[in-house]
């Protein structure tokens, strides 16, 4: 088993080395992985609803759950994605607009990613993403920006399938670096994304802990999918280190976990004709050190509990999808660790999204989110030291009411003239 694991990690490290080298030279833009399409012989719309990454079709979910192993292994399983953006903010009032609204009304090259993915053996497959962020850091003195390359979502799987006249059982293991990245529906935190701009204001960044650990942790999980109906997963996460440091390569540890932290997932899925629907629950317990640089002493205890559902209608030329998720987080011990004034707080986050795509080319979506929670002057400060012995309002991200309450709408229109190119326009309010 150790030899097999070493072989898989060796494959992945080779993939990542190639990805880092090629990230500077591979052009193009992709909504789905062309390497997966080459391996399976299928087009992007076979795996992605309306061709829109990352929303998976039933076939796409099957491909992922069976370890990315369907089809024949290709010689060079690499793909590339490039994202450019232009952002115009209506109200740029700020004490430091060059920082808070940098590059406003400027067309720019935002990020580039290289993906290494596909079949390694009959039962082992990999999805690995390396991303270059062209505007990763800003020098506080010169205000100049610099780029940075880092590990993104990584999922290494072992999977098998038992088929019979009345039985279809898929089971496997996933080694990954983001809670819920192993999931196959687009309602969990790792995949319930719209297309954000790097410089647009999208409200305070407060989110449940399950959504804050990506690319900082290592998780090992076991999962099963019975008769394409019942999905169950249980995983354990720790801060990535030692032999698993490649899972966080290039990323700063902002949230350091104490020991092992469980994540569980249960979902029921049903498919009839062009329709499919899912209803699920998920949860995570996490013990977090207050200072990631000094992992010792008391911890803050986070308990996330979520419910989600998804609907899809897939019948050419129409694709309709709808998603809903709600996460309630309880936070305890923050007064001891210094991250909050209260001994106990709560955080609630709801997300809704609906989309329509015609002929996998023209489409639109409407998203809504709402975050609420306990008032706490330490966790959600509204004032800061002005450097002259007084206090001033924290611009942009501060909360005058000392709470995380935020809500917003994101309508979007998009066009895919060819399979691997997507152009979109969105409005955030």
Pin down the residues of each PLM region.
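Boundary of Sec targeting at the N-terminus
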Residues: 31-33
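Outer membrane beta-barrel
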Residues: 55-57, 78-88, 103-242, 258-274, ...
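N-terminal secretory signal peptides that target proteins for export/translocation
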Residues: 1-12
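Transmembrane beta-barrel outer-membrane domains
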Residues: 73-75, 105-109, 147-151, 211-215, ...
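Detector for outer-membrane/organellar transmembrane beta-barrel domains
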Residues: 274-411, 415
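The canonical Cys-X-X-Cys-His
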Residues: 42-51
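Short cysteine/histidine-rich metal-coordination sites, predominantly Zn2+-binding motifs
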Residues: 56-70
């Amino acid at each position: 088993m150790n030899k097999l694991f070493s072989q898989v990690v060796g494959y992945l490290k080779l993939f990542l080395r190639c990805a880092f080298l090629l990230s500077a030279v591979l052009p193009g833009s992709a909504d789905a992985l062309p390497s997966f399409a080459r391996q399976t012989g299928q087009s992007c719309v076979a795996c992605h609803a309306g061709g829109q990454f990352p929303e998976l079709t039933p076939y796409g979910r099957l491909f992922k759950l069976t370890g990315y192993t369907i089809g024949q292994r290709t010689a060079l399983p690499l793909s590339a994605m490039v994202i450019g953006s232009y952002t115009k903010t209506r109200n740029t009032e700020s004490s430091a607009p060059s920082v808070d609204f940098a590059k406003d009304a400027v067309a720019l090259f935002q990020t580039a990613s290289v993906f290494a993915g596909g079949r390694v053996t009959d039962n082992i497959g990999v999805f690995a993403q390396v991303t270059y962020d062209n505007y990763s850091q800003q020098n506080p003195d010169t205000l100049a920006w610099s780029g940075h390359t880092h590990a993104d979502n990584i999922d290494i799987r072992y999977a098998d399938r038992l088929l019979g006249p009345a039985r279809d059982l898929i089971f496997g293991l996933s080694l990954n670096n983001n809670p819920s990245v192993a999931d196959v529906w687009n309602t969990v935190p790792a995949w319930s994304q719209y297309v954000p701009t790097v410089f647009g204001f999208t409200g305070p960044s407060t989110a449940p802990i399950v959504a804050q650990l990506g690319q900082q942790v290592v998780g090992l999980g076991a999962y099963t999918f019975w008769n394409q109906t019942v999905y169950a997963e249980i995983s354990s996460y720790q801060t990535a280190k030692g032999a698993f440091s490649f899972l966080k390569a290039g990323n700063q540890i902002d949230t350091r976990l104490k020991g092992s932290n469980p994540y569980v997932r249960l979902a029921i899925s049903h498919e009839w004709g062009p329709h499919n629907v899912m209803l699920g629950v998920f949860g995570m317990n996490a013990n977090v050190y207050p200072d990631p640089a000094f992992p010792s002493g008391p911890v803050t205890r986070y308990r996330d509990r979520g419910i989600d559902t998804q609907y899809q209608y897939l019948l050419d030329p129409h694709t309709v999808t709808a998603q809903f998720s709600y996460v309630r987080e309880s936070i305890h011990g923050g007064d001891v660790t210094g991250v909050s004034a209260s001994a106990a707080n709560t955080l609630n986050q709801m997300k809704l999204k609906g989309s329509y795509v015609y002929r996998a080319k023209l489409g639109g979506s409407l998203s809504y989110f709402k975050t609420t929670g306990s008032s706490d002057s330490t966790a959600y400060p509204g004032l800061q030291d002005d450097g002259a012995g007084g206090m001033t309002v924290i611009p942009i991200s501060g909360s005058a009411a000392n709470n995380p309450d935020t809500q917003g709408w994101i309508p979007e229109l998009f066009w895919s003239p060819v399979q691997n190119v997507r152009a979109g326009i969105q409005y955030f309010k």
